[in-house]
Structures are given as C-alpha cells and as structure tokens.
From Swiss-Prot:
Species per Swiss-Prot/TrEMBL record: Staphylococcus haemolyticus (strain JCSC1435)
HAMAP family: MGT
Chain's role: Peptidoglycan polymerase that catalyzes glycan chain elongation using lipid-linked disaccharide-pentapeptide as the substrate.
Name of the protein: Monofunctional glycosyltransferase
InterPro entries associated with the record: Glyco_trans_51 (IPR001264), Glycosyltr_51/Transpeptidase (IPR050396), Lysozyme-like_dom_sf (IPR023346), Monofunct_glyco_trans (IPR022978), PBP_transglycosylase (IPR036950)
Primary enzyme class: transferase
Membrane topology according to the record: Single-pass membrane protein
Length: 270
C-alpha cells in the first residue's frame, strides 16, 4: 500500500473529514491545572476558614468564662459537715485523685487529652464521654445541671480554667469532696463517712475513729454511680472497681504495699 493511501485510511484523517476532534496522545493539554493541586487549594481554604471560626468561637467562650463569677464556690464551706482537704489524710485525697483525675496537680483545670477525647465523642455520639477533671466536675456539680451537650462541656472547661486561676488545688479538692453525691442523701465526704462507716475524714478529730484506706477507696469508687453501687450488698463489679482504685493508689504512692494488702484483706469481709 502506498504512503498516500495509508494516510487517507488513518483514523486522524477520517476524524478530520468528520469534523471530529483529534486528541494528541503524546502531550498533556496546556492551561488546565492538575486536579490534585486544585483539591489541595480547596482543602487549604476550608481548613483556614475552620481554624478562623474555631479560634473566634474559643476566644468568645474564653472571654465569657473570664467574666464568670466563681466566688460562689466559697459557700460550700458553710456546710455544717464541711471538712477542708488540708485536714484529711493523704490517702483520702489520693483515693479520689487516683480514680477521677490522676493529673490533678499537673493540669490547669482541664486535661487536654481527656477533654479532646470527650469533645470528639460528643460530636460523634451527641453525648459526653468522660474526660472531666476534678475541677471540671466541681464546676458542673455547682453551676450546671446534668445536661450533656457540646456547648455545656465547653462552658464547663473554661469556667474550670477560671477556678484554677482563683483557687488553690486543695481548695478545689475541698469544694469537690464536699459537694458531690455519695448516695443515701449524703453530699459531703464527712457526712458519707459518718453515715456508712461511723468514721470521720478529719484527721484532727477525736470524736470518731478515722476513716480507713479501704473506706476511702469505697467512697471514691461509689461516686461514679452512687445509686447503683451498694456498700451493704456489694456486687462483684463494685468490688472490682474498689480493687482497681486500691491498685492505682499504690501505684501513685498514696498508700504503701502493706496498706494495700491490708485493705484487700478487709475487702474480702464485705
């Protein structure tokens, strides 16, 4: 076949006669940016917008929390059974710290890791899953109801930061221990110790026997579900929770190994 005949029979020649576009398979079209770069620019813009809105929202919440009046927390000290954390044995404070907020003495009102987990859980499940420090729980118990929402969690977080700026750690711990529900209409740790064990958390008191390590661990383990965990008829789940608490107290050096072993032995009698 002659060269002219081959040219006439080629697809390119036929496409020209039919007014069809001829596509160059050797070169990329000029003037159109690659899709990947375009997608990156869109993502970057969306990210900048998100960061701006987030920063604006956080700034507004921080401003509002800075105006919050947390002086009212001092009224907790007016309770007749109030006992300051300064007057409690270290293992009493340790029982609650090791169970509820291991980093209590290190953070400034909220724990970044725990709070981030809780906030993302809130967004995904429409619910709040843990993450609250002792300071946040103190704020929630005093200022807010049991509403579970993203907005309430943020308010709690920033007011907790204000509380940390205004009060010492022992003051905050005192507020917490004297304003949580222990079950059976008991709202201070002293009244709970009196009611359940006939003991006192005040290490300077001679009127009653001092609360034991095990009793402290029981109360600290109970506040998570005070209406469910029954001290007079302990479930296996409750006992396991108490054992976990005692282990944490030993690991964090709030109690010695001998105190730990003694408490475990006493727990078997329940």
């Amino acid at each position: 076949m002659k060269r002219s005949q081959r040219m006439n029979n080629s697809p390119e020649r036929h496409s020209q006669y039919r007014n069809e576009p001829h596509y160059n398979t050797y070169y990329q079209p000029v003037g159109k940016p690659p899709k990947k770069k375009k997608n990156k620019r869109i993502f970057l813009r969306l990210f900048i917008i998100f960061v701006f809105i987030y920063a604006l929202f956080i700034g507004l919440m921080y401003y509002l929390s800075s105006r919050a009046n947390v002086d009212d927390l001092k009224t907790i000290e007016n309770k007749s059974s109030y006992v300051s954390a300064d007057n409690m044995p270290d293992y009493v404070k340790g029982a609650f710290i090791s169970m509820e907020d291991e980093r209590f003495y290190k953070h400034h009102g909220f724990d970044v890791k725990g709070t981030t987990r809780a906030l993302f859980s809130t967004i995904g499940d429409r619910d709040v899953q843990g993450g609250s420090t002792i300071t946040q729980q103190t704020v929630k118990n005093y200022y807010y109801d049991n509403e579970r929402s993203f907005t309430r969690k943020l308010k709690e977080l920033f007011v907790a930061h204000k509380v940390e700026q205004q009060y010492s750690k022992n003051e905050i711990l005192s507020f917490y221990l004297n304003n949580i529900y222990y079950g059976s209409d008991q709202y201070t740790i002293e009244s709970a110790a009196n009611y359940y064990f006939g003991t006192t958390v005040n290490k300077n008191s001679d009127s009653m026997s001092q609360i034991t390590v095990l009793q402290s661990a029981i109360l600290a383990s109970k506040v998570n579900a005070p209406s469910v965990y029954d001290i007079s008829n302990m479930s296996d789940n409750f006992k396991n929770r108490i054992k976990t608490n005692l282990e944490k107290m030993k690991q964090q050096e709030y109690i010695s190994d001998s105190q730990y072993q003694e408490a475990l032995s006493q727990l078997n009698n329940y």
